[in-house]
């Protein structure tokens, strides 16, 4: 895909995802937790879109290796965040 076309598609998709998040927040009667879940979903999709369209993650001869590095970093981040939350909740509930 041409670079200009790729950047244009990525830009338009990012704007659409942002507007969808604004619409969900302002114009729906969903619960707070449902809104946050949907917005986080849009955020993760937009982050992946940014990596693929603008950061050229999969391009070049090391594209596949870069993809594995990003996936590994995401897994480490999730383990750290979820593990920290789990430990904090366990410590908080044992003190009550």
Swiss-Prot record:
Signal peptide: none
EC identifiers of the protein: 1.10.3.-
Topology of this chain in the membrane: Multi-pass membrane protein
Gene Ontology CC: one annotated term: plasma membrane
Lineage, uppermost ranks: Bacteria, Bacillati, Bacillota, Bacilli, Bacillales
Keyword Transmembrane helix in record: yes
Protein's name according to its UniProt entry: Probable quinol oxidase subunit 4
Bilayer-spanning residue ranges: 8-28, 36-56, 68-88
Family designation: Belongs to the cytochrome c oxidase bacterial subunit 4 family.
GO BP terms, alphabetized: aerobic electron transport chain; ATP synthesis coupled electron transport; electron transport coupled proton transport
Cited PANTHER family: CYTOCHROME BO(3) UBIQUINOL OXIDASE SUBUNIT 4
Localization of this protein: Cell membrane
EC main group: oxidoreductase
A single GO molecular function term of this UniProt record: proton transmembrane transporter activity
UniProt cross-references to Pfam families, sorted A to Z: COX4_pro
Summary of the function given for this chain in its UniProt record: Catalyzes quinol oxidation with the concomitant reduction of oxygen to water.
UniProt keyword terms in alphabetical order: Cell membrane, Membrane, Oxidoreductase, Transmembrane, Transmembrane helix
Family matches, as InterPro entries: Cyt_c_oxidase_su4_prok, Cytochrome_c_oxidase_bac_sub4, QoxD
UniProt key word Flavoprotein: no
Reactions catalysed according to its record: 2 a quinol + O2 = 2 a quinone + 2 H2O
């Amino acid at each position: 895909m041409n670079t200009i076309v790729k950047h244009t598609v990525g830009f338009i998709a990012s704007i659409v995802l942002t507007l969808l998040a604004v619409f969900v927040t302002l114009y729906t009667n969903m619960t707070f937790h449902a809104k946050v879940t949907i917005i986080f979903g849009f955020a993760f999709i937009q982050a992946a879109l940014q990596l693929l369209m603008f950061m050229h993650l999969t391009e070049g001869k090391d594209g596949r290796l870069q993809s594995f590095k990003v996936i590994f970093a995401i897994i480490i981040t999730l383990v750290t965040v979820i593990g920290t939350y789990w430990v904090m909740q366990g410590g908080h509930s044992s003190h009550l």
